[in-house]
Swiss-Prot record:
Annotated compartments: Cell membrane
Quaternary structure, from the entry: Component of the accessory SecA2/SecY2 protein translocase complex required to export cell wall proteins. May form heterotrimers with SecE and SecG subunits.
Species this chain originates from: Streptococcus agalactiae serotype Ia (strain ATCC 27591 / A909 / CDC SS700)
Coiled-coil residue windows: none
Protein name: Accessory Sec system protein translocase subunit SecY2
Encoding gene per record: secY2
Spans through the membrane: 16-36, 61-81, 104-124, 132-152, 161-181, 190-210, 242-262, 286-306, 341-361, 374-394
Job description of the protein: Part of the accessory SecA2/SecY2 system specifically required for export of possible cell wall proteins. The central subunit of a protein translocation channel.
Keywords: Cell membrane, Membrane, Protein transport, Translocation, Transmembrane, Transmembrane helix, Transport
Amino acid sequence: MKLLYIFEKNIILRKILITFSLIIIFLLGRYVPIPGVLISAYKGQDNNFATLYSTVTGGNLSQVGVFSLGIGPMMTTMILLRLFTIGKYSSGVSQKVQQFRQNVVMLVIAIIQGLAIAISFQYHNGFSLTKLLLATMILVTGAYIISWIGNLNAEYGFGGMTILVVVGMLVGQFNNIPLIFELFQDGYQLAIILFLLWTLVAMYLMITFERSEYRIPVMRTSIHNRLVDDAYMPIKVNASGGMAFMYVYTLLMFPQYIIILLRSIFPTNPDITSYNDYFSLSSIQGVVIYMILMLVLSVAFTFVNIDPTKISEAMRESGDFIPNYRPGKETQSYLSKICYLFGTFSGFFMAFLGGVPLLFALGNDNLRTVSSMTGIFMMITGMSFMILDEFQVIRIRKQYTSVFENEEN
């Protein structure tokens, strides 16, 4: 009874235990085999980017399992829905309708991705349409289960869907340790050392920019003491965080799923395969597009996380204002310029730090997996701060009690 009382009263302990339990379920599901499919017989294993993408989105293609799709379908759905609702307000749409739309789009995306992966499986006693459809259905179901686990964690635990992605990426990087040692022994000592040093520098800069902020002076009408001169609006230098990396991989990988399906339908058409170079990190075109997308998404996520429109409206309603800028459109325009400035800055530095190793490894299949390490660990660093910030908010909130709370409790 005492343990149950502690579990009920200690919100931090309760959230940690719930998150830990959900992570265990998530990790176990990654290794639950699909009936009729040969484990570790994914015919697309030579596609290092597909395996990397599955790791980034919490999936696992290095060993075929129920959760091989990860949260990829949900991420693609979020991108598509956001693209089609740019400039539109969804406040008039009920939560139920929004959820229905999201589930329908996610189902279509999951079926496309599931079919593309299931086609690349090797099956016991040969291929059949029944086995293909069964494997696809299981993969789609697994994607929805992961989405459900992430939503449970967001409501009752720490980190939401983010912590599942971080855990999946860490497990994937641990699996790459033997490859690093093997390359080190095969004469790639200098390249490995340079990659590791570059990754450490990138992580240090990521931490520095993540904790740096630009302070905009704000006149608070509700403050009538000496603190009025110290009031400011903090704008993070890297407001996009590490999310841009994950969504870049999503945008690059989804067209590859389409190409896989088209290639299976039209196996004699060589033009279909040629389009793959534009979305693969093993080609110069793919790396350049990767860096461009990184810049664009960094700016986009900066606007999403800061939202100048909402901030300017909230300031106008409260009576607060930025010196030398009129409330409303003028304030919104000023904040938008700040977002463009820092979004472009963070986009350039992340594209440069994540793209240079990929350019260096072009033409060398042995170094391709190691070269992606920089972007992965920058992503882990950015997402870890998101989780730590959530933990900090709960810890601070726990220090304050309700005015009406009985002192004996």
